[in-house]
Regions:
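Adenine nucleotide-associated cytosolic modules
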Residues: 1-187
Length: 187
């Protein structure tokens, strides 16, 4: 069944059977199940990432559905983490899904990221980006950081725990922008 499910990965010389086994053993925590996090979660599950954590304290709103396609109309009012976890299980029941219906904070960040090798930031605020950067640096975790604004986006991978030559988010952006100086995703 796995050979058939992951056949398109396995035939790629860059992935193959060994690479697919690594994906099946991988663990990723996705922080945010909205505009960025939702497609990340779908592709990670489809690729066969063995363990996926979903953390989000928000609920699904009607305005989310046109761009956060992991959620459905019947999920309006439901926790985004719960809705996303259900869709992941439907897409790939072999994936272990950890569900956290809470906000990541300074009080829970280090413990929250500990079980995962990679942390993917799908949030839309600078405070959380800096928090995840600092927690990943301290815990020796890889941080995948994405950001979107209208039709523009950026993606970076930070491995600052690997030492010199591996900058962190804070190395590139030492100070958060002043409040109100950068538009939010809702604008």
């Amino acid at each position: 069944d796995q050979i058939q499910r992951y056949a398109r990965h396995i035939v790629l010389p860059e992935v193959g059977g060994v690479g697919q086994e690594k994906l099946l053993e991988a663990s990723v925590l996705v922080v945010g199940a909205g505009g960025l996090g939702a497609p990340m979660l779908q592709y990670l599950a489809a690729a066969g990432i063995g363990r996926i954590g979903v953390i989000d304290d928000d609920t699904v709103d009607l305005s989310n559905l046109q761009r956060q396609i992991i959620h459905r109309t019947q999920d309006i009012g439901v926790s985004k983490a719960e809705s996303a976890a259900r869709m992941i299980r439907d897409l790939n029941p072999e994936v272990r899904v950890d569900l956290y219906k809470e906000r990541i904070t300074a009080a829970n960040a280090l413990d929250g990221i500990q079980p995962y090798a990679i942390v993917a930031d799908g949030t839309d605020n600078f405070a959380t980006r800096y928090l995840l950067n600092d927690a990943c640096h301290l815990a020796g975790k890889t941080l995948v950081s994405g950001a979107l604004l209208r039709f523009e986006g950026q993606l970076s991978v930070f491995k600052s725990h690997e030492g010199e030559g591996h900058p962190c988010y804070r190395c590139l952006f030492p100070e958060p922008p002043a409040p109100g100086s950068v538009p939010s995703c809702s604008e």
